[in-house]
C-alpha cells in the first residue's frame, strides 16, 4: 500500500522504507532525519507473531522511548476511542497500555483516539464484508447496540495535519464523525452495499462476557 502512495506524491517528496518495527538501529536512524513521528501501526486481529500486545503496547513503548532519546519535536500516536470501558477485550487492553506508555515516555506526545475509521478498502469494512459474503449469519455482540461515530480517513488526516502545523495544542484528541450509529446499523448498511441477506443473531451482554 505504501508504494501506491508514492505514485500520488511529487517525485522526491515521499520515501518508502521497509523495516522490522523492532529494529532499534533502523528506527533510530530514521528518527535522526525527522522532527515529527506519526505512529499509525495497528491490527484488528491477531495472526501468528502479530499479537495485540506486541503491536499496540510493546512497539509504542519502544518508539516513544526512542523519540525521547532523539529529542524529536512531536510524536503523534494513533490509539482508539472507548478502550477504557472495554476491560475484557485484549485489543482494547493492549491499545490502552500502549497509549499510557507513550504518555509516560514522551511528554510532547499527542494521542489521537478515533472511532471507526472508514474509507475505500479500509480494513474494518473489508473484513466485515468478507465475513458477510462467506457466513450465512452474523453474531451481534452486545445485541449490536454498541454505538460508534465513524470518521472518514480524510477528516482524520486533516486533524493530523493541523497538529503537524501547530494549529492544535491538545494532548489527547477524540476523533469522531457527525453520525452516531450502532454496530447493527453498520452491518445492515454493509449488507445493503453487497446486496446480501444474512441472519443476524443478537448475543446478550452476559453471554458476550463469558
Label the model's feature ranges.
Residues 3-4, 8-62, 66-69, 81-85:
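NAD(P)H-binding glycine-rich loop region in Rossmannoid oxidoreductase-like domains
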Residues 9-16, 106-107, 196-198:
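A short helix-to-beta-strand connector/capping loop
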Residues 11-14, 129-142, 201:
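A short C-terminal helix-loop "cap" of Rossmann-like NAD(P)-dependent dehydrogenase/epimerase domains
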Residues 43-44, 55-105, 109-115:
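Conserved Rossmann-fold NAD(P)-dependent oxidoreductase catalytic core, especially the SDR/UDP-sugar
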Residues 83, 117-119, 156:
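Conserved sequence/active-site signature of Rossmann-fold short-chain dehydrogenase/reductase
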Residues 87-90, 110-131, 146-147, 181-182, ...:
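Flexible, glycine-rich beta-alpha linker
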Residues 123-124, 143-165, 171, 183-185:
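Substrate-positioning beta->alpha
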Residues 163-210:
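Mid/C-terminal beta-alpha module of Rossmann-like enzyme folds, strongest
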